[in-house]
Structure formats: C-alpha cells, structure tokens
Design a protein with these regions (language model features):
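Histidine/acidic-residue-rich, glycine-tolerant segments that coordinate divalent metal ions
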Residues: 64, 86-88, 95-107, 113-114, ...
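Acidic/His- and Gly-rich active-site-bordering loop/insert found
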Residues: 2-108, 113, 117-121, 125-138
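Conserved short loop/turn motifs at secondary-structure junctions
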Residues: 32-33, 142-146, 295-300
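A non-catalytic, amphipathic alpha-helix used as a structural packing/dimerization or gating element
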Residues: 8, 12-22, 39, 43, ...
C-alpha cells in the first residue's frame, strides 16, 4: 500500500500527465540529432522555468546541456533526461508502416522523446513533494544531450558535474515494466585523418604518398590484431573519407573512424593504444602522416542493487500502466511487424530458467500485444554489448 506521501506523488503525476505528454509529442516532432538539439533544449528550458526550477544553461560549455534545480540540503537527487534522435528514422506518430514526417529525416527510434519528458515529470513530482512537506533535499533535472553520439554525460563527468549527487536516476522506454540491471561495454571512438602527397596515378605515382593506402593498411593491421584481443573486446570501423572518386589520382587525404569496446574502460584504453600504434605503422609504411581526433568515450555502467531494490518495491506498490482497446490494437499491429515473442528484452528471461518460466506465464507465452505486467525481480552483473554514457554518471 502506498504511503500518504507516495499517494500525493501519484496524484500529481496523474493530474499533470497531459502536460508532460504534450512535451513528449513536441520532442518527437523536433527529432534533433546529437549535440544539435537546440529546439528541444529550448523547449525544456522553458518548461523548467514554467515549473519553478532554477535553470542553468550551457552546462560544461555544451550548448544543449542544462539543468533545473529545486530545494536545498541533502539528499541531492539527480534525474537524467535525454532528448536526441537518430538519423533516417523520421516517422509519423501512431502509424505501423514506414511513413516519415520528413523524408530522410531523423526520428526517435529509441524513444528519447519519452525519456526526457518522463524524467522531467519525475523531477516535477519530487519538487511538489519538497514544497508540500517542507523537508530538506534537492532535486536536479539534467538535460543530457548527445547520448546517441557524442557522449554528453562523459564530458559532463569530466567537469565533475556528478560529484554533488547522492544518487542519480534514469529510465528508458521499452516494452516491459521492469527495473534495469546489469552492466554494458565501455567504448572509445577515435577518428584517424591521414595526409599524403597527391600525384597522377599513371604519370607520376612514384612521387605520390597515398593517404588512402594508409587507411587500407591500418584496416589490415587491425584485422590481424583481432586474434590477440580478449573475447569481450570488439573493434568497429567506418571509412569516412576516401579522398575522392578518381582512381587515377593518388589520394592525399583519407580518414577512418574507429570504435573499440571492452567490458572495462581500462581495457578499452589499452586496446585503443594498440589501434593507435597500428595507425602509426600505417603512416610509416606509406610515407604519410595522420591526425588523431578523439571523438568520445564512455565507461561501463556500475549497477546499484540497493537502488534497484527500492525501485522495484515502489513499482510493486504503484502498479503498472493500464491500456485501452485502441492502445492494445495499435500494439498488436506494431508487434506483427517484427519477429519474436516480445519477451526477449525482459531482464533475466534469457539467463534464468525460473524467470523465463514466470515471464512466459505472465505474457501468455508471449502472445500478449503488450507486456502489461511487472517483470519478476532480477539482479545481475551480466553485460550488454552496447554502450551508454549513463555509465559515466554511475
């Protein structure tokens, strides 16, 4: 049963739901890419002021990073909001077939329109509680840009922004009501920009120094490195600039972007150093030079089982959302467009046979269009292969 304080929080959220739903819809329409979320940031800044938060813009020198705070004293609780979109995923809301708002435009494939709005709702509810109770404590909503690319939270960590917090909370839209657990890979991205000497490939090749050759030799070197990595490591690359489209020219410029992953950030740093050495070797072999441009890096997430337990207890007490017939019909239509039972994303359903048994029973063997139940409690240190800059807050 919910305490009187928690009943007040629930009533606040229910009463203000349309306000925050409208924010989510507007962010869906803005759909701005990482570190370019200018309209989205402006919308949130306006709403924070409207809600009575003290606002700080351009946190850590990042144009679209900001925060809104309320209260005084401890504990200091940070609630993280994200709002960046992904390229090429523009989509009209409520439709189950591809139908972009802007052909070729960006869209919210990861639901960050909901993530930011939901986090703001949580911060506003805590503010209302502090106002009504008169108790000490500070709540801070952080507008965190560049989660999809740019690792905004990592640069905010570099400036020591998270040190003032006693706890930080975040959430992510998904197809299950659950407490997230486990960790993820750390990651580093570096761009290598090679420079050589142009020449005619037929008439004067001996005076040319090919930057494109350097990129290709670097890629070959990394391929041979793969055998000597530990199994948890990954290396990915994309040639971002071939120098030109004329094969009869020795290309003087070429670039390649590398991403390395490992379970621990210290191991990513070691692996990245080996990739750096391969770039040096490629330049030496081709008589070229290169510029190393650090793009971003993220640490692994450190799970906090105490907070996980508190979250789960409150989710049990408050219950899961209910859905009307129209929402269930839309969910069923969406589910029909992709394979799987819809339970694959539930924590523990793959790793733990007992959890899987419970989930199958609750989901009707995966037949339900929506997972309208609270997933069983599950804590783990298992590793997700992807990355998130939330790790740099943990």
């Amino acid at each position: 049963m919910l305490s009187a304080d928690k009943q007040g929080l629930a009533a606040f959220l229910d009463g203000h739901a349309p306000y925050f739903e409208e924010i989510a819809d507007r962010i869906w329409e803005h759909a701005e890419l990482s570190l370019k979320e200018y309209a989205s940031a402006a919308l949130y800044l306006g709403k924070l002021r409207e809600l009575g938060f003290t606002v700080t813009e351009k946190l850590c020198g990042i144009d679209t990073a900001f925060c809104g705070s309320y209260g005084s004293g401890r504990p200091v609780i940070g609630i993280l909001g994200e709002f960046d979109a992904l390229s090429g995923l523009s989509q009209k809301a409520g439709e189950t077939a591809h139908n972009p708002l802007v052909p070729g435009g960006s869209g919210h494939g990861c639901g960050h329109n909901l993530l930011g709005a939901g986090s703001l709702a949580a911060a506003a509810a805590v503010k209302a509680y502090l106002e009504q109770s008169g108790r000490p404590g500070t709540v801070i909503f952080y507008g965190c840009p560049g989660e999809e690319g740019g690792a905004g939270k990592a640069f905010m960590a570099r400036e020591g922004l998270w040190k003032q917090l006693d706890a930080a909370l975040c959430w992510h839209p998904g197809d299950a009501n659950q407490v997230s657990t486990g960790t993820n890979n750390s990651c580093i991205q570096v761009l290598y920009k090679f420079s050589g000497v142009p020449a005619h490939a037929a008439g004067d090749p001996f005076n040319g120094r090919s930057a494109l050759d350097a990129v290709e030799l670097m890629n070959v070197g990394v391929q041979f490195l793969r055998e000597h990595m530990t199994p948890d490591c990954r290396i990915h690359y994309a040639i971002t600039d071939t120098g030109g489209i004329s094969p009869n020219v020795v290309q003087a410029k070429a670039s390649v972007l590398y991403m390395v992953r490992a379970n621990k950030v210290a191991d990513s740093v070691k692996l990245q150093a080996r990739v750096d050495d391969i770039a040096k070797g490629a330049a030496l072999m081709t008589g070229t030079s290169f510029e190393r441009v650090f793009i971003d890096g993220t640490a692994e997430l450190l799970p906090n089982f105490s907070i996980e337990n508190a979250l789960y207890a409150n989710m049990e007490a408050i219950g899961v959302p209910s859905f009307d017939e129209d929402e269930l019909a839309l969910a069923a239509a969406l589910k029909a467009t992709y394979p799987g039972s819809g339970i694959e994303g539930i924590k523990g359903a793959r790793e733990n046979p007992e959890i899987r048994k419970q989930v199958l029973a609750l989901s009707g063997n995966g037949a339900k269009p929506l997972n309208d139940f609270l997933a069983p409690r599950y804590s783990s240190t298992s590793i997700s292969p992807g990355r998130t800059d939330v790790g740099d807050v943990s």
